């Protein structure tokens, strides 16, 4: 999740495809295998990562990007010493605008330099261009498709939205849960 200085964005067409489930499990596994691992909740439309780990969501990524917080808002997960989480914080009215700012790309580069692995949970592509913008600034993306749910046209559209971006496609996961 940090090959060549990249973070890995977990993306999918729709809500309920399993992005948060996949991102959290991947981050836990990477942390258990060794190396400092950061899980970033960049789903500023419907954040859930803080709930999975029972962490505070008072401040986080949205605060950093809007200049109201610093990186001290990254929280260590008690049960897994090498796992850290950057929650969303207050849900902003302008999530896509925040991730389009140069500050998001700069933050991702800084986080990749400080952690061995960086995994990023994203909003569903159906809600806007956030996921594609986030993936481009992460540098790598893993696409999720949900069995009997994801439409092939929506998957093609999502992959096509990344075509002009500097994104390494890590693959597609066919998910059933």
Model-derived segments and their meaning:
Residues 1-177:
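P-loop NTP-binding module
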């Amino acid at each position: 999740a940090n090959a060549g200085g990249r973070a890995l964005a977990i993306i999918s067409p729709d809500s309920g495809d399993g992005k948060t489930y996949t991102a959290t499990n991947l981050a836990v596994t990477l942390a258990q295998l060794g190396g400092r691992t950061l899980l970033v909740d960049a789903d500023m439309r419907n954040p859930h990562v803080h709930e999975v780990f029972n962490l505070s969501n008072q401040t986080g990524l949205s605060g950093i990007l809007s200049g109201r917080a610093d990186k001290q808002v990254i929280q260590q997960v008690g049960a897994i010493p090498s796992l850290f989480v950057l929650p969303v914080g207050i849900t902003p009215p302008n999530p896509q605008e925040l991730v389009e700012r140069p500050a998001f790309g700069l933050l991702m580069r800084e986080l990749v330099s400080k952690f061995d692995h960086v995994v990023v949970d994203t909003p569903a592509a159906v809600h806007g261009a956030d996921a594609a913008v986030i993936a481009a600034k992460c540098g790598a993306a893993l696409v999720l498709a949900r069995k009997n749910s994801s439409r092939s046209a929506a998957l093609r559209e999502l992959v096509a939205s990344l075509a002009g971006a500097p994104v390494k496609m890590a693959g597609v996961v066919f998910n059933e849960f």
